[in-house]
Amino acid sequence: MIGKLIKKIFGSKNERELKRMGKVVTLINALEPELQKLSDEQLKEKTTELRNRYSAGETLDQLLPEAFAVVREAGRRVLGMRHFDVQLIGGMTLHEGRIAEMRTGEGKTLVSTLPAYLHALAGKGVHVVTVNDYLASRDANWMRPLYEALGMSVGVIQSMQPAVLKRQAYASDITYGTNNEYGFDYLRDNMALSKQDKVQRPLNYAIIDEVDSILIDEARTPLIISGAAENSAEMYKRVNQLVTKLTRQIDNGEDGDRRVISVAGDFTVDEKSRQVELTEGGHQHVEELLIKANLLAPDQNLYAANNLTLLHHVNSALRAHALFHRDIEYIVQEGQVVLIDEHTGRTMPGRRLSEGLHQAIEAKESVEIQSESQTLASTTFQNYFRLYPTLAGMTGTADTEAYEFREIYGLDVVVIPTNRPIQRIDMNDKVYLSLEEKYAAIVEDVKAFSANNAPVLVGTASIETSEEMSRRLTSAGIKHQVLNAKFHAQEAEIIAQAGRPGTVTIATNMAGRGTDIVLGGRWESEVEKLENATPEQIDAIKAEWEKRHDIVLAAGGLHIVGTERHESRRIDNQLRGRAGRQGDPGVTRFYLSLEDNLMRIFASDRMRNFMQALGMEKGEAIEHRMVNNAIENAQRKVEGRNFDIRKQLLEFDDVANDQRQIVYHQRNELLDAENIRDTITVVRADVLNDVVSQYIPPQSIEDMWDIAGLEKQLEVDFGLRLSIAKWLEEDTRLHEEPLRKRILDEVQATYDAKCERIGEIMLEIEKQVMLQVLDNSWKEHLAAMDHLRQGINLRSYAQRNPKQEYKRESFELFQQLLQRVKHETIHLLARVEPITREQMEAMEIQRREELARQKMQMRHEQLSAMPESPEAESEPAAAPQRQAPVVREGRKVGRNDPCPCGSGKKYKNCHGQLE
């Protein structure tokens, strides 16, 4: 009550922000008459003037009114588009490092020019981030005349672009590109062999278009640069054949504490958490099948440590069959399994599921199984974009995720008012008992809307549903066009004509996002089809478009038909936002049934029972605000669960991210340094001290010393034969500290002599050796971290907190990494022999060829929230113990040794195939 009263007196936070920025808009408007008097050249010179003022100490905040006024005037002259006052407010929101929620058709692309120009004055570069190459190129070329009229350079980065062109694009004042390409370039730069190989400048300011898509929908998608690993294609095929013989257990829910099973089976499926688990009987059945197929020894257990790889194959195959369905989560295209983005309905070529799941689906679909890969470098969008000192974003739907933006990224959301009042009508949902009734109602309503000359957009959540709707509309004789992942190439043309009178378009989720549906269709598309169109032809096309536009307005504008609710309210709002652009009329409605996934899995039993108790006749629908509220509550549950998963993934990746930043910082220092001799000297002293301490414990008596062992170790590590025992016999005053110093002096003198013999090239060798050791060790460390994270869930069963265990053990692994880099570097430098400049260059070429063979991948993490028992929180921490990822138990078996399973075969031809 008090909160409402305060809000009424002082206004909401959003209203107060808009009021504050409105005062600055008044200042910008006051500058407009003076700027209109300037010539084009004088307007261009304003950029130099503003840059000089920034260099002299003025802040970007102080320059903002004049800079925005300059951009507005350039837009009016060059593009014929003058920024509205609300667009200026959007620009200020972006400048301040926040998210501007702007409705569809409110000109987000034009808004971005304001803060992009302002921040480019600082000379540190501005990155404008889009979701695909087409939008990056389109927006850059569309806004290029405006920027160039003000003396600003514009660059575009695209996938597969040569490094020299990328370097030029990044050197521009304003750079357009995709989130994927920015992230991959960051990773590649941190694998570069020299400073000259890098393409990016230090990160400064980024504006993310469709920020919700990139920072929330893509948050669970790590960017990974990988190299080829061992091929296990045959194992995937064999396990896939076995899994098809397993049956699913059907549960009828719970009766008190007892689970009621209607059909016993080998595995259970939890659709909410997307998990598959073997039942007790299923575990026995799988072991029997594996033994029969000679994949498991008769006396072996599937859960033994040396069979973890086999268990991993079984679990992956189970998930591929039970959780992933063709034409819903993926399609098979040209002999490849291509994933479908659940949020947009677009295909994602080149993107693969991690942890062997993609290979399991390939085996299921009987297509070529691509080899698994080894991670060489990785990051997440969450951690990459948090590297920018200032980050901003634009989208039509951010307010429902405002808490997550603030919690994860520290970004506040400001809802920007529309330039014209919204005329769209959002109708209550219609809820039917069955899918069949729902589809029949949709067909009837679409037929009526289309007959009334209203354009109709039918939004679906999957390719399967879009094709089902297409079949039903065809049967009803309704002409329509389909826009889904299978028809990606025709997307622009379909969207361009989707606003014509009576046109019916079926689209998966938000396919076509980023392009407005214009009422009456886009007349520009018709002009583009004509070669050398005359003014008369253009006028005729415009006149025809005016007629169509008026017909559509009279029919109530674009009609949106949602065939089901998405898990996220934000995706539903995006679909609704396709109608009612720039004050146009429009109507939206969602059609649901109790058999829809969201209703079946997440809606409460109470609502289901309530609807059935009403005794609804076949074909009847419930249309009430109470039903809408119940559905929104179900969506909030799912959103909360997904947020917890994303937050938890971030907490795990934050551990790796801290380590990544340390390694990349050290690597950059190595690249920048001309001479690392002093660093090598310090590292050598540390390594030598560690080696000596193993055989001469600090502050120990001489009887505890292992001099013979020390002499042998020094020969192994440093290639030196030192007669330490003889030194001690000859000099009784040679105690621990003097002895350490003498050993170090001998090692240093030997190394100095080698450097003298090899010459100046030794400086380059030192640098390259340390870089190579760091890269190889980091690669091994990433693999160890992957193994650690995959098994860390199980710690909760031992009453331990998985997060705390992960942090502790990853820290130990990182300490080992740093020690390994030091020891390996000194060991290699001690063994290095003189080489020529030509040999050095040949080694460099070989490393570059290896880099060129690496693949850029985006993997979907299929991780659910990790279990954390309350007991784990309160239990005292266990004594620290060094723990490496479990790979095998017992003695390591040679590849040509007899297999321990007793089959009589060589290990490499039997169970060694699993490694």
Swiss-Prot record:
Membrane topology listed for this record: Peripheral membrane protein
Residue sites binding Zn(2+) per the record: 899, 901, 910-911
EC main group: translocase
Main location: membrane
TM annotation in the entry: none
Keyword Kinase: no
SUPFAM superfamilies: Helical scaffold and wing domains of SecA, P-loop containing nucleoside triphosphate hydrolases, Pre-protein crosslinking domain of SecA
First and last residue of the signal peptide: none
Keywords: ATP-binding, Cell inner membrane, Cell membrane, Cytoplasm, Membrane, Metal-binding, Nucleotide-binding, Protein transport, Translocase, Translocation, Transport, Zinc
Residue sites binding ATP per the record: 87, 105-109, 516
HAMAP family tied to this protein: SecA
Similarity field: Belongs to the SecA family.
Function description: Part of the Sec protein translocase complex. Interacts with the SecYEG preprotein conducting channel. Has a central role in coupling the hydrolysis of ATP to the transfer of proteins into and across the cell membrane, serving both as a receptor for the preprotein-SecB complex and as an ATP-driven molecular motor driving the stepwise translocation of polypeptide chains across the membrane.
Protein name: Protein translocase subunit SecA
Lineage, top ranks: Bacteria, Pseudomonadati, Pseudomonadota, Gammaproteobacteria, Cellvibrionales
Gene name of the record: secA
